[in-house]
Amino acid sequence: MKRFLLLLPLAFIGHQLTAQGQTSATQQPKHLLFDFRLNRTTAPLKIPLATQRTILGKVFRRYLTDEAKCNTQFQANGSDPLKAARTAGQIVPSIVGMSSGSFTAPGQTETLYLISVGECNASHADNFGTKRAAIFSGQQLVADVDADFKINIESKTDLNGDGLNELLLSGGDMNQGVLIETAALVDFPNGRRRVIEDFGTVTEDSCASGLPGSMAKASVIYLVDAAAGQMPKLRIENFQASCRTPKRWRFLSTGKMQE
């Protein structure tokens, strides 16, 4: 009887250890890439005016320095009015982001600038104009590509250790009190923008709308299955909080946020 009582706990413990081992094997260790629940503040860029003019002058053949100089009589023809405005020089561009690193090839010392093109005829429906990423090596423009309306540089990484930096870029828009923010992880091999992962909507905050049922939703992005020399898998976890208790986030889902 005593022997049976001793064996029962041992068998139970062995079962528990086996179960724990199975759980550990299925759980993937994760490392934080970025948390969109956090409040973010961006310090003003400190780029000398002469440098700004040099950069913009190499990206755009013609541009304006003041919105007041936009031609109110300008009429864009064709199916792409923003392109027509750029061609006509009816733009008021500004530099909104900057990062140094190796973007087009390993070992390069480069600076990437995010530029809000500011087409004169751009409306709220156009997200107030297109955005571009311009990469310079010293004074030489080596890449000029569309930034898909992204204006914020959230982080710079080299996740697979290939010597090329990736950027986590985001961009947002508010309409009738609802803030929507999207994000993507991109790199620029050989000067071409490549989307590594499009995270879609990472912030949806309707608290400012005052509508019934308003809430805030935000994504947290993790790295999983990280191995040397390989791009890790990316995991999205979504959370929500009420407008009354904005700091009390509750887990909502995994994967891209449902719109």
Residue ranges, per PLM feature:
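Sec-dependent N-terminal signal peptides
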Residues: 4-12
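Acidic, small-residue rich beta-repeat scaffolds with periodic aromatic anchors
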Residues: 16-81, 175-259
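Repeat-based blade/solenoid architectures
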Residues: 80-97, 145-154, 202-218
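Short consensus segments that form the blades of beta-propeller domains
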Residues: 88-90, 119-127, 173-178, 211-212
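Hydrophobic/aromatic beta-strand elements that line small-molecule binding cavities or substrate pockets
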Residues: 98-101, 133-134, 154-157, 183-186, ...
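Acidic/hydrophobic-patterned starts of short beta strands in beta-sheet-rich repeat architectures
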Residues: 102-116, 158-173, 223-238
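Long, charged/polar, surface-exposed segments that mediate recognition or autoinhibition
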Residues: 129-133, 140-142, 147, 155-160, ...
